[in-house]
Amino acid sequence: MNITLLANHDIASNLALNLLLPKLKDHRITVYLSSRVGKVGAKPQALEALQSFEQALLHSLSEESDSHASTASRLQSFSALGKLIGRPIDTLNQINSPAGQSILAAGRPDLVVTIRYGVILQQPVIALPRHGVINLHSGPLPDYRGVMASFWGMLKGASELGTTLH
């Protein structure tokens, strides 16, 4: 099956791909990353600091996994994961644009799975894969819509955290 995974260029998505991609080795996998989650604009200073820290961790992970011959016990960088699936992992922020739709359609996906992808897919994109789109949302819907759902749950003192697969 041709499966396209849409994720974000962050630690949580990297971990998810490290866990998921080895299980999909019998399928043809394509991965596209968004470069952010949420709206474009000024962020609070604390979020800027968190993003800088996370990007430094990703850079360190990339250097570490590229310099070790055996990384079986370590998280693989996005670059190393691209080697695992036999194709580079590219950034695709404008997936709803005609050019983005063409890029997605060229892979002829049977299924699209989104995990923390930073763009809400519009109907023309949703209609492309033969078996549809599955989205993993980081919180229970409809209570925790939007980005950082797990953190909103913790902030509100939720006794349980969850996800929504829809």
Could you describe each region identified by the protein language model?
Residues 1-166:
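One-carbon transfer enzymes
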